[in-house]
Amino acid sequence: MSGAALGIEIVVVFFLALFLLHRYGDFKKQQRMVLFGTLLAWYLCFLIVFILPLDVSTTIYNQCLIDQEAQTQTPSVSPVLSEQTTANASISPAKSTQRVCYKPWSYIPDGIMPVFWRVVYWTSQCLTWLLLPFMQSYARSGGFTITGKIKTALIENAIYYGTYLFIFGSLLIYVAVHPQWHLSWYELQTIGITAANTWGLFLLVLLLGYGLVDIPRSYWEASRQGHLLIKTYFKAAKLMTEKADSEENLEDVMEEVRKINESIKYNHPLRKNVDTILRKCPLEYQEKMGRNMDDFEDFDDKQNSYPTERSLSKLHKQVIYAVQRHNRTRVQWQILLEQAFHLEDVAKNETSTSRQFVHSFAPPEPVGWFRRYIYTPTAEWYWECLLKQWFYRVLAVVLALFSVAVVWSECTFFSTHPVLSLFAVFIQLAERDYNYLYIEMACFITIFFLCTCVYSTVFRIRVFNYYYLASHHQTDAYSLQFSGMLFCRLTPPLCLNFLGLIHMDSAISHQAKKQTAYTSIMGSMRVLSFIANGFYIYYPMLIVVLCIATYFSLGTRCLNLLGFQQFMGENEMTSDLIDEGRELLRRERRKRQRIEDGENRRREWRERYAQRDENAARNRTSMSEMKETNYGETLNANTNRQAKYTRSGSQSGRDSIELLQDAEPLDFNAETLTDDPLQSDTGRHAGGRYLSMSSSRNRIFDDV
């Protein structure tokens, strides 16, 4: 298994990142460079999360080998244990003269991990600090040529890059003027990594303090169906306002595009730029603008009334932003409608005596084998109406305990004697028994929980609502690039902070132990002692203050006072928005119900009259065959008596007989007769037999 686990995880993580990108992105419509950059960013960040536990278990094994070698070189002496050593014996691994080191199942040979981490780390840093911000500006640029887009992207990122260069230059000057330090390439590299990790840790603590409280509370609130439904009504009212604003903004921008489209004809030099703008517009607007277009117009006499290329670039950027905003709000509205309708269905089915879950609307996708045989309506009722709320409550309690452990460990991870960090205690207990599988699973679950708290916060806070990850291929390119940039920026300091929690970072724990390969790539933080001994230790304690503020919803109350309406339980404005959202969802439900009823009626009519047409055609075919057979038998049997029953034996006589036999009776009581073949398909003309829907009895004025 030497290196096999590493190779397997590299392949599995790649397909995981590809699957998630396919779920959220659109391979057919979005640019290849956007998809490639996002895939690479996600892949590298997922590699750090999945491979770091293997690095931890391998480091523990190598440390065991070092301790074993040190014991064999020193004589066996029975030490006298002090009270402090005895007290810490339950935490630190027991030392014996005959210590046996067991190789982990996922052992990675020496020399592989440093190269691997160096490639992963520096590639992700190039993506997050250089390429992805540039690609974001390039994708939103209004330029019509590659050169114009590159120029615009460089101008927009000048302040962005200048800020980081200023921070790096300040740290470089600080180190250069220090008399005890002699700068080398390794130390310069460490300064750059320290600057990036410091900025990442600054954002990390702010986001983590909110997520540690909000995620357990969100699951607890999800177990209360009534509260969740009321909150959904509130979100619907706010989202409808934003949706209407985006539609109005799109209409205004499309009006400007229409005016320019009518003024600039096909022989104008800027017409190709206008065509580029039109291709970014929604299809319905493209069709409207393409109807009243002349082929040629002399523009030499009206040169001053035409827009410039710069104004077209500005309009192009406005079109891109307006279309993205409109699509984002439209997708959010559809997702919110599905959630609200589902919650209303759950509320209705809770009082059902049949114990079968009934949906208000048919599912858009056909029912698969899972819902047909396993997740039946009865199983769905028990899950949605009984088990789900209790499962969410238990999960909320577990996550709350996990959050408390994280907060405690963040405040005490710098203490090594005694060991106060809970995660360090658990890892050292498993290290004593060489339970490498437990170590790797504990590391992965902890890192995954921290990543969830951090990343979900960005997409939950209202200020960051511009970025939205929507499934079913509905995420725009800007949100994909932002997510990749954010993951690459926060994952390395998050994992470094985790190594400090479990005392695997010697710069924080100050223990003479073998470092992980990941920590060795980060360099020694002792180059900047005020960061290693100050900021990295005391700044994470700010999580306590942030968690308390989040628990009492201080941020929500402040935003509400500033005019940003937030969900507050006892507030008049909140009650008005809840009522408005309830009415909006009632209208949408009636609208969707009418559409579904109309489709059902059309389907029934098509099935009914398609079957009647099929039966009528089958009857006509069988009757025609029977008549032809009877006529043939009669003709053969009465060949000698042909003159007795016919006036002549000519071919014209037989043809007239066949025409009379094939003719079908007409309904002269029918009000109208039509020869339109399209009406016969709709059931109005079914073989001459379904032309009248009136009664067959005589009317008063039939003889007039």
UniProtKB/Swiss-Prot annotation:
Residues 631-654 have a biased composition (Polar residues). GO terms for biological process: adrenergic receptor signaling pathway. The keyword Nucleotidyltransferase does not apply. Residues 1-3, 55-111, 179-192, 415-438, 503-527 are extracellular. Glycans are attached at N88. The keyword Transmembrane helix applies. This is G-protein coupled receptor-associated protein LMBRD2B.
